[in-house]
Amino acid sequence: MENTQENPASQSAEENGSETQAAQDAAPAAEAADAALAEAQAKVAELQESYLRAKAETENVRRRAQEDVAKAHKFAIESFAEHLLPVLDSLEAAVGDTSGDIAKVREGVELTLRQLTSALEKGRVVAINPVGEKFDPHRHQAISMVPADQEPNTVVTVLQKGYTIADRVLRPALVTVAQPK
């Protein structure tokens, strides 16, 4: 019978040699893994910083937009008010006039009306004067129906003008409408 057992000392030396070889082989891999980890951590830090900058910029844009909207609301009427100042000046001059000349007062009132109409038009306020138009319940308010030679549901007279601002009705025109025959 042959002895197939190896010497325990030689077996231990072989294991130590293979472990040393494995450790030597693992060292470059560990260094590469450490380098990859460090690179990934640096990338994460960079992305976090970019995220925080983008978030701060977004907040600044949102805040500026809110401030712009607040200013727009606050000063929206400024231009309109500037156009009304000449009307105010004319009315104050008329009140201060003590001449008693009716023709002069009438001329001043007509001028003031033209100034007011101009100021309203600059503010995009437009009169609705729909005589002869088809009745539109969105723009007109019928006060009565009257017999007329016009087509039924046509505006016959305007009792009070209506007004729109940028195609939105501020006040509907008060009208009488032709009765169906």
Swiss-Prot record:
Annotated region described as Disordered, given as residue ranges: 1-39
Record field: compositional bias (Polar residues): 1-20
Pfam families (UniProt xref): GrpE
InterPro entries per record: GrpE, GrpE_coiled_coil, GrpE_head
Residue ranges, compositional bias (Low complexity): 21-39
Keywords on record: Chaperone, Cytoplasm, Stress response
GO MF, one example: protein-folding chaperone binding
Role summary: Participates actively in the response to hyperosmotic and heat shock by preventing the aggregation of stress-denatured proteins, in association with DnaK and GrpE. It is the nucleotide exchange factor for DnaK and may function as a thermosensor. Unfolded proteins bind initially to DnaJ; upon interaction with the DnaJ-bound protein, DnaK hydrolyzes its bound ATP, resulting in the formation of a stable complex. GrpE releases ADP from DnaK; ATP binding to DnaK triggers the release of the substrate protein, thus completing the reaction cycle.
Assembly, per entry: Homodimer.
Protein family according to the UniProt entry: Belongs to the GrpE family.
Name of this protein: Protein GrpE
Gene of this entry: grpE
